[in-house]
Amino acid sequence: VGLVVAAVIVASVWSLTRDSLRLSLDGVPVGIRIDEVEKTMEAVPGVKAVHHIHVWAISTTENALTAHVVLAELPRMETVKRQLKAELETAGIHHVTLEFESSAEHCPGTCD
């Protein structure tokens, strides 16, 4: 009986330790694929490209994203931003920070 209890405790501790380590190292959350997030974002009308994407867990239930978004037309920025945030929320990403660029100001290779 004691070994069974010890095994249950070890299994619980391992799961908690793994999740805590992933959170503390800002790892990509389980179930989130960066390539799928990029495809979802680029499918929004008005988005020409997406780059410099970072996704991390804020907690065990909340995820965050930052990304650079290249727009076909800057005047549509607010509309595109609302659509992107709605799509990302559906994908389980609730805290979103986006930096918008025109295709003329695109920063490949120079983004920090």
Model segments located where?
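Alpha-helical transmembrane segments and adjacent TM-loop junctions that form the membrane-embedded core
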Residues: V1-D112
